[in-house]
Curated annotation (Swiss-Prot):
Family the entry assigns: Belongs to the peptidase T1B family.
Protein name (Swiss-Prot/TrEMBL): Proteasome subunit beta type-1
GO cellular component: cytosol; nucleoplasm; proteasome core complex; proteasome core complex, beta-subunit complex
Modification type Phosphotyrosine: residues: 149
Residues bearing carbohydrate: 57, 208
Length: 240
């Protein structure tokens, strides 16, 4: 049986007065929403892969099953964004506008490293009201080697060989650490990562993530960046 103090706590949480009458209730507005989704990027010797699922959800509702989170920026650069879908769209539009301005001014496309530095300044400029987005950039650098850049919401970034972000990142990152980075492993030969093995690995980890993460699923969109350009591949995932 609840004590008098416990009843008062319940009344206070429900906004009820001392005699059960409804009291004033404060409604809170949040400018953010989490729309789920997972992005991943892997860099090889002469290629880079950026992949994401296509599910767009909120809570227990699926808004659409065909919303890929990989956006082509140039012929050598792709960005993966997950988090709040509204911020993802806004941020990618700003980046695309900056890239067009740069190309018109310099008669050439911005490099992958320069795009990463530009994105860092954009995110830092919004540090007091940040974009709720997990950003990963994948592409080729000036020497034609694969490059991956990962960001936090306020602009701090670093170059990696592989990175996962989004709702299933806690499941994907340990697999990448083990299979790509060979971390915490003894007597293992560090063989270079081939494109075929990287593709198989990306498909396997996303199939596993879709089994465990309710916000990841429906389909897998893979963008493969090579010196020939960018090609896309779609793989079905579970839809429940």
């Amino acid at each position: 049986m609840l004590s008098t103090a416990a009843y008062r706590d319940v009344e206070r949480e429900l906004g009820m007065g001392p005699h059960g009458s409804a009291g004033p209730v404060q409604l809170r507005f949040s400018p953010y929403a989490f729309n789920g989704g997972t992005v991943l990027a892997i860099a090889g010797e002469d290629f880079s892969i950026v992949a994401s699922d296509t599910r767009l959800s909120e809570g227990f509702s699926i808004h659409t099953r065909d919303s890929p989170k990989c956006y082509k920026l140039t012929d050598k650069t792709v960005i993966g964004c997950s988090g709040f879908h509204g911020d993802c769209l806004t941020l990618t539009k700003i980046i695309e506008a900056r890239l067009k301005m740069y190309k018109h001014s310099n008669n050439k496309a911005m490099t992958t490293g320069a795009i990463a530095a530009m994105l860092s300044t954009i995110l830092y400029s919004r540090r007091f009201f940040p974009y709720y987005v997990y950003n990963i950039i994948g592409g080729l650098d000036e020497e034609g080697k694969g490059a991956v850049y990962s960001f936090d919401p306020v602009g701090s970034y670093q170059r990696d060989s592989f990175k996962a972000g989004g709702s299933a990142s806690a499941m994907l990152q340990p697999l990448l650490d083990n299979q790509v980075g060979f971390k915490n492993m003894q007597n293992v030969e560090h063989v270079p990562l081939t494109l075929d093995r990287a593709m198989r690995l990306v498909k396997d980890v996303f199939i596993s993530a879709a089994e465990r993460d309710v916000y990841t699923g429906d389909a897998l969109r893979i963008c493969i960046v090579t010196k020939e350009g960018i090609r896309e591949e779609t793989v079905p995932l579970r839809k429940d």
